[in-house]
Amino acid sequence: MAVPKQKSSKSRGRKRRTHQKVAAPTLTVCPECQEAKLPHAACPACGAYRNRNVRPDAVEA
């Protein structure tokens, strides 16, 4: 197993970790009810997907 020869400094370790971040989710606007929703997914508010209601239990907007 590999063992480090030198102790890595705090700044070096933190520089390496700058790329490990969580990206914010991409949101789009539902064309039916104008609510924010994830792309390629049914709207959680009205249940519309590609101009059709795919959730019969959703309230009509």
Curated annotation (Swiss-Prot):
Organism annotation: Desulforapulum autotrophicum (strain ATCC 43914 / DSM 3382 / VKM B-1955 / HRM2) (Desulfobacterium autotrophicum)
**Residue ranges of the region described as Disordered:** 1-22
Q: Give the matching InterPro entries.
A: Ribosomal_bL32, Ribosomal_bL32_bact, Ribosomal_zn-bd
Q: Which domain of life is it from?
A: Bacteria
* TM stretches of this protein: none
Matching Pfam families: Ribosomal_L32p
Family stated for the protein in its record: Belongs to the bacterial ribosomal protein bL32 family.
**Sequence ranges of Basic residues compositional bias:** 7-20
User: What are the record keywords, sorted?
Assistant: Ribonucleoprotein, Ribosomal protein
Named from the GO MF annotations, one term is:
structural constituent of ribosome
Q: Gene for this protein?
A: rpmF
- Give the signal peptide, or none: none
Biological process terms in GO annotation: translation
A GO CC term assigned to this protein in UniProt? large ribosomal subunit
Q: What is this protein called?
A: Large ribosomal subunit protein bL32
